[in-house]
Amino acid sequence: SLVISDLFSAIERDSAVIEAAAAELRPLLPPEGPVLVLGVGNRRVTADALGPRTVQKVFVTMGPRTVPVQGIRPVAAVAPGVSAATGLSLQQLAGALVRELRPAALLCVDSLCSAEPERLGRTLQFSDTGLHPAQPDHSRHLDAARLGVPVLAAGIPTLMQAEEGRDLVVTPRDLDGVIAHGAALLGAAINRALQPKLSVAQLCWLVG
């Protein structure tokens, strides 16, 4: 994980922070092969919108009319939505995409839950053990055993349980800003980790 003292100063063009975050993620990735970035969460709920907002910042290089370019890694990105809107579980959607695209790895981006308030909106976290949300619903759990490919996870803590036994959550004061800046920063770090031959400035220009 990478701790950031002030997320709002570490915008998507802060190359030092982006390079540090990319350096955390890059060793977890396979050395080559296509990568599918999955934006997990509900774009209509601010605290849960980090995944969908981040995939909008990912440099996508795959497509039906895309010509492979030497040195550019094939990358696809999608935000599958929530099961209440699609009628399909996250596992079903991720499994179908993996079977169709056959990526070397699946990178899931999601809002995280923290047990420590000081970590809210201030930590970029990366894992190579899959995505295991706090909810007891196992249809949202994604890992190599279920999907047959390495599953990485990336995210920022955006909420925490208020008190044990109470159905309340705590979020950062400026949650909209945390999601907006966090998605931009995380997207830039993912791009840099996936495309090491392109500079931060080049990637920012390509994504827009």
Question: What is each stretch, according to the model?
Answer:
Residues G71-R102, L106:
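A structural-propensity feature for long, helix-poor, extended segments
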Residues V3-S5, P34-V45, A77-G81:
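Short glycine-rich or small-residue beta-strand-to-loop segments that form or flank ligand, phosphate
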Residues V35, A104-A105, V151:
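Conserved acidic residues
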